[in-house]
A protein has these predicted regions:
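Acidic/histidine-rich helix-loop elements
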Residues: 10-21, 284-300
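Hydrophobic faces of well-ordered beta-strands that scaffold small-molecule active sites
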Residues: 3-8, 38-40, 69-74, 97-101, ...
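Catalytic pocket-lining loop regions of alpha/beta-barrel enzymes
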Residues: 98, 105-204, 255-257, 264, ...
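Histidine/acidic-residue-rich catalytic or RNA/ligand-binding cores of hydrolases
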Residues: 14-18, 138-144, 165-172, 190-197, ...
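Active-site environment of divalent metal-dependent phosphoester hydrolases
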Residues: 11-14, 45-49, 76-80, 107-108, ...
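Conserved, mostly hydrophobic/aromatic
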Residues: 7, 30, 57, 61, ...
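Mid-to-C-terminal alpha-helical segments outside catalytic/metal-binding sites
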Residues: 1-10, 19-37, 200-202, 212-277, ...
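Active-site gating/metal-coordination segments in enzymes
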Residues: 36-37, 45, 52-128, 134, ...
Length: 362
């Protein structure tokens, strides 16, 4: 299957040791994972100068133009810089229609980007919003305003994890031109939930940090969706937004190390792992009302679903802490969780939830 990632980055910046200091290092990572193409932005454009960093990006990825496509960082200052808006418009006219918003790092509220976006709307731009786990409430209100005022734009929420996830779902409900990438969706059954409520076309494939390696690929491979829907998320939806045809064949070569990694090959093909004992050391059960969004609210049913997922992935045991014990009566709820786990002998081991407010109860 082909993969087209929406949120890669290259370059050295002020705030972290880079995963990918240059285009070649990113391409090596994409090859290792079997990812054919990626939208990439320059850290220099985010941390220092958008205009100079965007120009340097084009030069850096030019030798790999078949596989690396640019995303240009934009900021409100572009409006006041001589020639920058004209340059952005010329790039959009040439087909480079992806732009990235990094308001927290670039120090501006989202609403201030409107003058720049207004200059680009005729090109149906794709705006990548850098959420980094959880964007602010004001940012999401500003994104709603932009998406409503300019229906020709496409807003993609990137790197969104469970924190504040309800505001993403709310924004997708309010605005049909808002999309979500899969890079940080480290929550159970989220791909299926978004599909059921908003349609499979609203999901785009993305990768996280280098340390994530194939997490997003594995999540997509194991999602309970059709093969056709999997292809749409992996590359088809982004190709449609950018009006690009898929390559006639995979661009990522088969990495020689994969021959030594039969477990990974089996998992990314959608099968459970075999001939290896796996204990998952960090899980939760019980109802959730603190940012998590799950279709099943009842604890006994959640345990049944967890066992189904464990069997699907090849996990033998799961170590869990109980949600109700975390936020309620530690004695009653820890005991209740233990009784519920007995319905699946040997599959669950519990972390005893302790709250010093109730030390005398233990």
């Amino acid at each position: 299957m082909q993969y087209f990632a929406v949120n890669a980055m290259i370059g050295k910046g002020a705030y972290a040791v880079p995963d990918f200091p240059d285009a070649s290092s990113l391409l090596g990572h994409l090859d290792y994972l079997g990812i054919d193409r990626a939208i990439v932005y320059a850290v220099e454009a985010r941390d220092a100068s958008p205009y100079l960093g965007n120009q340097a990006l084009l030069e850096a990825i030019a030798p790999f133009a078949e596989r690396l496509l640019p995303a240009f960082v934009i900021t409100p200052s572009n409006t006041f810089e001589t020639g920058v808006i004209d340059w952005l418009r010329s790039q959009a006219a040439a087909g480079h229609r992806v732009f990235r918003l990094c308001p927290e790092v670039c120090r501006f509220p989202v609403r201030q980007i409107e003058r720049v976006v207004a200059e680009l709307t005729e090109f149906e731009p794709v705006l990548l919003y850098d959420s980094r786990f959880s964007g602010t409430e004001s940012s999401f209100r500003d994104l709603e305003d932009l998406a409503t005022r300019y229906p020709s734009i496409r807003v993609v929420i990137c790197q969104q994890m469970w924190g504040g996830f309800t505001q993403v779902l709310d924004l997708m409900w309010r605005c049909r031109n808002v999309y979500l990438d899969t890079s940080w969706l480290h929550m159970r059954d989220t791909i299926e939930l978004v599909r059921d409520h908003f349609g499979i076309d609203r999901l785009l494939f993305g990768i996280g940090y280098k340390s994530h390696y194939g997490a997003a690929i594995g999540a997509l491979a194991q999602a309970r969706i059709s093969a056709a829907d999997r292809e749409l998320i992996a590359h088809g939806n982004l190709e449609r937004l950018l009006q690009l045809a898929p390559p006639p064949a995979k661009l990522a070569p088969e990495h020689p190390l994969l021959a030594q990694k039969p477990l990974w090959k089996r998992f990314k093909d959608g099968h459970p792992l075999e001939n290896v004992t796996i204990y998952d050391a960090h899980g939760h059960n019980g109802p959730h009302a603190r940012g998590w969004v799950l279709a099943t609210p009842d604890t006994p049913e959640i345990l049944d679903i967890l066992v189904q997922r464990m069997d699907q992935y090849g996990v033998e045991k799961l170590f869990v802490s109980d949600g109700k014990a975390l936020f309620g009566d530690i004695v009653v709820e820890n005991r209740r969780a233990e009784r519920l786990a007995e319905r699946h002998p040997g599959r669950f081991h519990g972390y005893f939830v302790y709250n010093p407010l109730y030390a005398d109860d233990v």
